[in-house]
From Swiss-Prot:
UniProt keyword terms in alphabetical order: Glycoprotein, Membrane, Transmembrane, Transmembrane helix, Transport
Compartmental location: Membrane
A Pfam family hit: AA_permease_2
Name recorded for this polypeptide: Putative amino acid/polyamine transporter MPH_07630_2
Family: Belongs to the amino acid-polyamine-organocation (APC) superfamily.
Transmembrane segments: 2-21, 30-50, 81-101, 121-141, 151-171, 193-213, 231-251, 277-297, 330-350, 358-378, 403-423
Topology within the bilayer: Multi-pass membrane protein
Organism: Macrophomina phaseolina (strain MS6)
Matching InterPro entries: AA/rel_permease1 (IPR002293), Amino_acid_permease_CS (IPR004840)
PROSITE patterns documented for this protein: AMINO_ACID_PERMEASE_1
Amino acid sequence: MIGFSFSIVTSWSALSGVLVVGVESGGPPVMIWSWVGVCAVSLAVAYSMAEMCSAYPVAGGQYSWVAILAPKKWARGLSYVCGWFMLIGILSMGAVNNFIAGNFVLGMANLTYPEYTIERWHAVLVAYLICIVAALSSIFLPHLLNRISKAILIWNICSFFICFITILATNDHKQPASFVFADFQNSTGFNKAYAAIIGILQSAFGMCCYDAPAHMTEEIKDARKQAPRAIVMSVWLGFLTGFVFLISLCFCMGGIDETASTPTGVPLIAIFHNSTGSVAGTCALTSLITVVALVCANSLMTEGGRAVYAFARDRGLPFSRALSRVHPTLGVPVAGILATAAVQAAFNSIYFGTVTGFNTVISIATEGFYVSYAIPLLVRILSRVSGDKRERLDGPYSLGRWGLLANVVGFTYLAFAVITFNFPTVDPVDKENMNYTSAASFKFIQDISNQAE
């Protein structure tokens, strides 16, 4: 289960997929120090969620915990909102991962054949292909999930060591320590403080999705121990691998402008090529990460199918009867997986028309997860301060007296992050670079409110 969870969190490769955000908004110092800070507070969130998961191991995860732990008059409404944000986070993150994996493939093609120009529709079609393969494997090869999880954990860790050791060993023109740890880079047009806040978003994106084991609890043995441990361990592994990899990338980075505007569309590929000086070597290293992203696509498809199934089983979705069925022969929620694939493809289709629209999907993906994490933490805080009889949760991961501190620290960070996800990232702001996350979130909340009536 740790392998399954880390294949989704896989922070070191996730950070490389959105590297351009950190490069332009504060540069290496913000990327590195914000990563340390984000991971520290994310551990508070992870331990809080692990405590609830060990007490209530159900496939619904955070929305089920809210339904159980919230005051009765608020439980239904809060659980419903939490479930929808959880679902939109999982589904949109799957689309984002498909896009990132596709970008790696197209970036390698551009590096190998410089005359090839990457078009937006190329990226969408490759994302479609990844989505289809992930859906088919989730439907017809679920019996291989445990083996794949174990194998990808080994592949993930080995790829991490191969990538960072290779670029450090081959790069003979490394950046000075001052560039990595002190020199502030700002291409946003905003002041330094604002740019630093925007730069934190890269770290926030790289450290989420660690709720995945909670949605698999009904299919694993000893779920009260295994799932919470996987939640916590995926954050620890993500922190350590992400920290080392970020420092390695920053030392081996070329010029900021050159890295951010690489024709491959992937700054990581530019850094690999700047270090190795070899197209073949760069493609070999990028291929290692591409495999991680492809397996992540399968894991997110599996998680999404289970989340749709669980929410439909609790009658939280339209067409709940159909979406909550488990195929009698295959033993998986086929309708839930197909619905997940359809929504992912729809999100990817936005890139046909607008880059800004798809960037909004990236923000919504992280915001969806973070809101769904924040609601159960808020419920736990209210339970503790109000003296609710369920103040202490029994389970292998009970936090005891440290629970309130973890809940408060985690909730404070999540609330801050959810607000900053709505900030514009470039000044001057116009209709092309505006951050439409707040508008999309408002429309989403309006829609689920109308459905609830």
